[in-house]
Amino acid sequence: MNTFTRTKVPFVPLEGNRVGWYICGPTVYDSAHMGHARNYVNFDVLRRVMSDYFRYDVRFIMNVTDIDDKIVMRAHLRRSEAVLAKVRDGEHTELADALRALLASGERDLGEQERLTKALATSVGDPDASEWSIQTAYLELAHKFEAEFMEDMRLMGVAKPDMLTRVSEYTDKIVTYIQQIINRGYAYASNGSVYFDVPSFENAPNHKYAKLNKAALENVELAMDGEGALAADASEKRAENDFVLWKKSKPGEPAWDSPWGMGRPGWHIECSAMCSDVLGETVDINGGGIDLNFPHHENQLAQSEAFYDCEQWVNTFVHTGHLHIDGLKMSKSLKNFITIGAALKMYSARQIRFLFLLHQWCDPMDLTPVAARDKETGDERVVGFAQMEQAVAIEKVFVEFFHQVKGVMRLTPGGYS
């Protein structure tokens, strides 16, 4: 299924038998859940079919998003909570109460949060009070969850990508990439940030915005979600559909130098720069979960076509379907997710892979958790999924079949010994 055409079309590589394939990897701020497992298992199966059955020479690239607002906010939260845990009852109440109130308010003033946390850390004698820095703390957090994600993939039987790219290793190239888009006339600087000029791109004779999602120009709210939780005021934009390429960093946020001032990359430009650096000006396949269709992939496509000033950068887009829990998308924001680690305590990786194979990879899939009450704590916890019964039965047939084949081969003259 090619998302460009929304139909099944014959796949034809751009260059002989070689296939350049880029998929969007995890944003590493928390443990991966079953929705992630379905996404990467599906791509693993598709990749194996392409390379092992059709014998394409596949170059499979995956990125790790290790610069992101979610990571920055989580790093600050973990630091604040760690310092608050050291406060004894009745001590440093003014600072502690002020920090707790800020966290409870939901305000995203990371500069003030960092100031209060540092002051409280100094008061309680925390040894890291003067050393802690968001510039290093966010990356330590990202490294932790990247390692956990890669171990989850290993346990799930997902083959490693041929190349893994990290945003933190590409900041200089991202700056150069953005400058080229500005030089082409499709981006502009505003108050230390840089924005993609959607109207200029849309009005160019050889370009078109909203190729993947025809409603993209109308869905401003979803577009804003793609700007990140720490996005600047929308008044900096010339048009409401414009999106950020480079974010001016505020106090409490990590920052890198650029011609426009200290800041960090926007989400969409990260993939454009990394994919272009590895695969160049034409890409056979770009993939990810269906939630990335818009705004991420739509904007990634526009940026790259602006950079190369070409009509089509990607030949085929493939998107895997959502995994739902009782009809709702599994996500960390909804807090209805089951981690891969927890699922592997209930079922084997092979059983989970069979479960995913029972559903069309590009369609939504629904899971119904089976809960039981813990005898010791009295709390309810998920102990399985109603849909797993068929997958477990299939695995049993699979194991028995190959056990019999193995036995026949041993007894057959000329068979293996």
Predicted regions and their residues:
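NTP-dependent nucleotidyl-transfer catalytic core
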Residues: 1-316, 386, 404, 409-416
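Catalytic adenosine-cofactor/nucleotide-binding cores of aminoacyl-tRNA synthetases and other
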Residues: 111, 311, 319-416
